[in-house]
Every structure is written in structure tokens, then in C-alpha cells.
Design a protein with these regions (language model features):
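Non-DNA-binding regulatory cores of transcription-related proteins
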Residues: 70-143
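Pre-recognition alpha-helix immediately N-terminal to the DNA-recognition helix
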Residues: 27-32
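A short acidic, leucine-rich amphipathic alpha-helix
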Residues: 44-50, 61
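Short helix-coil-helix linker/hinge
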Residues: 22-25
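Short capping segments at the starts of secondary-structure elements
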Residues: 36-41
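Basic amphipathic alpha-helical segments that dock to polyanions
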Residues: 61-71
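Short, Lys/Arg-enriched N-terminal segment that forms or immediately precedes the first helix
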Residues: 5-19
């Protein structure tokens, strides 16, 4: 059994926990969100599904996204512009984001140094980090 099949089984189990069935619509939404482009709004996901001739209502997409978030398949992103974006957590190790306030471009980055500093700060105050969200809002340097 490959990784994709394992994730689909886990998704089916999550749906079962929610007393829902794995329909062709939910399966298409799962594939689109998990294996499609990153950092997309619900509307972009709906548009992509329509282009692929998948008939899923916006309500079904939102409900499925909520389940994907609840069961840790997907991360919900608020980058401060009033629009929520979604990003798969499957196959994407922890990373942070830089968001350009002029263009909206989202740049992913990893810094072991920043991670270590955050852990040291938490420990210094008697805590252990269980999760964090690190977003840098940036502007291009004008030369």
C-alpha cells in the first residue's frame, strides 16, 4: 500500500468518525486540497474542481475542509488580508511563511536557528512548544 492509499484510508476513517461517507465529491476535494497547489482560498479550490468536472458545492468543500483541518491533514492560513487560505500538511514538513504585503506572495522558509531560539525561549519560561505559527509580513527592499 502506497502513501496516497494510506492517507485516503485515514481520510475515510476521519469521515466515518464524523458519521459521513467517502463520496466521489469528498474524494475529489481531498485530492485537490492535499495534492493540488498550496495556499489557496476555498473559491480557488471550487474553481479547480469545476474545471475537472467535479460537482461539489461550496458548502461541501467548506465542510470537507473543516474535517481536513480537524484531523490534521490541512492547515488553515490567515495572512491578514481577510481571506483564508488552505495548505496541505501531508508531505510538507514544518515551515514558516513570509507574506509580501504589496503583492500577497507567500514564500515558505525553514530556519533551524529560529526554531531553536523559539524552543529556548519557551524552556526559559518553563514551557515546551507544542505547535506554533510563524509568519513574517514583508515588503520588497527598494534599491
Amino acid at each position: 500500500m502506497n502513501k496516497k492509499e494510506k492517507y485516503r484510508i485515514k481520510f475515510a476513517e476521519a469521515l466515518q468518525n464524523e458519521k459521513l461517507k467517502l463520496t466521489s465529491q469528498r474524494s475529489a476535494i481531498f485530492d485537490e486540497v492535499i495534492y493540488g497547489e498550496k495556499h489557496r482560498e476555498c473559491e480557488e479550490i471550487c474553481d479547480s474542481l469545476k474545471k475537472k468536472n467535479h460537482n461539489a458545492s461550496r458548502a461541501t468543500v467548506y465542510r470537507t475542509l473543516d474535517i481536513l483541518i480537524k484531523y490534521d491533514f490541512v492547515r488553515k492560513m490567515d495572512i491578514g488580508d481577510g481571506r483564508i487560505r488552505y495548505e496541505s500538511k501531508i508531505g510538507h514538513p514544518h515551515h514558516d511563511h513570509m507574506i509580501c504585503v504589496e503583492t500577497g506572495k507567500i514564500i515558505e522558509f525553514v530556519s533551524d536557528e529560529i526554531e531553536n531560539i523559539q524552543e529556548e525561549i519557551a524552556e526559559k519560561h518553563g514551557y515546551k512548544i507544542i505547535k506554533h505559527i510563524h509568519q513574517l509580513f514583508v515588503k520588497p527592499i527598494k534599491k
